[in-house]
Amino acid sequence: MRKVLRVKKNIKIARIVPLVLLLVACGRGEVTAQSSSGWDQLVYLFARAIQWLSFDGSIGVGIILFTLTIRLMLMPLFNMQIKSSQKMQDIQPELRELQRKYAGKDTQTRMKLAEESQALYKKYGVNPYASLLPLLIQMPVMIALFQALTRVSFLKTGTFLWVELAQHDHLYLLPVLAAVFTFLSTWLTNLAAKEKNVMMTVMIYVMPLMIFFMGFNLASGVVLYWTVSNAFQVVQLLLLNNPFKIIAERQRLANEEKERRLRERRARKKAMKRK
């Protein structure tokens, strides 16, 4: 019973924390050095860092460099999240089998399901909540960076290449690039999954469309951040968690298992003939 309650408690925490972060991040007023709240001070700190990285006064360059710096710092957490998610996907068939086996709603059955599930997690070295921690750490950082671009006045000015950072891109090239890299990052993330999640498959196409249409009206500085962040994620996936290599390795292991079983059958047939 304690394990069931602990699982429920962790699920509630996982749901509440993002909501709290969202409420904190909903401020729309301008952020200055005199802003009093701790959250606004973090936003302003990010803005000053971007300004410091803006070589020759180019805020666009500052946005790119700061985004890359943040993504590099968060890379170990991202890698942990991806690996944990992959492990959870690998054991989903066995988890579903347990859920079918212990389908009852009574307390004793639920306790048994929790115990068997914990044993399965231990067997494969999986922590079902490990993928949540990196996400919860990344969320406030990414939200603060987003708000630095929208709530601090000195980041709303300047140009980068063909765009005014405070205005939307009249050529719509940045929204297109942001949508393309968003599609690639979500597609690559889902590509190596053993079992395709319907919601994730839908998001592969919905997220890029949302980014594309939102990019029509948002300041180009924000869309530039989205573009660089998702482009970095694509490169990171290909280097550290290449789905094509994962699929190839999975296929190799499947072929080896198939060959092993074939050899065993042949050996049994030979043994029977000798008798």
Swiss-Prot record:
Q: Record's superkingdom?
A: Bacteria
Lipid attachment (S-diacylglycerol cysteine) is at C26
Could you list the residue ranges that cross the membrane? 58-78, 129-149, 171-191, 198-216, 222-240
Alphabetical UniProt keywords: Cell membrane, Chaperone, Lipoprotein, Membrane, Palmitate, Protein transport, Signal, Transmembrane, Transmembrane helix, Transport
Q: Which GO terms describe its biological process?
A: protein insertion into membrane; protein transport
A cellular component term, taken from the record's GO annotations: plasma membrane
Localization terms from the record: Cell membrane
> What InterPro entries does the record point to?
YidC/ALB3/OXA1/COX18, YidC/Oxa/ALB_C, YidC/YidC1/YidC2_Firmicutes, YidC_ALB_C
Q: Which HAMAP family match?
A: YidC_type2 (MF_01811)
The protein in question is named: Membrane protein insertase YidC 1
| Record organism | Streptococcus pyogenes serotype M1
Annotated gene: yidC1
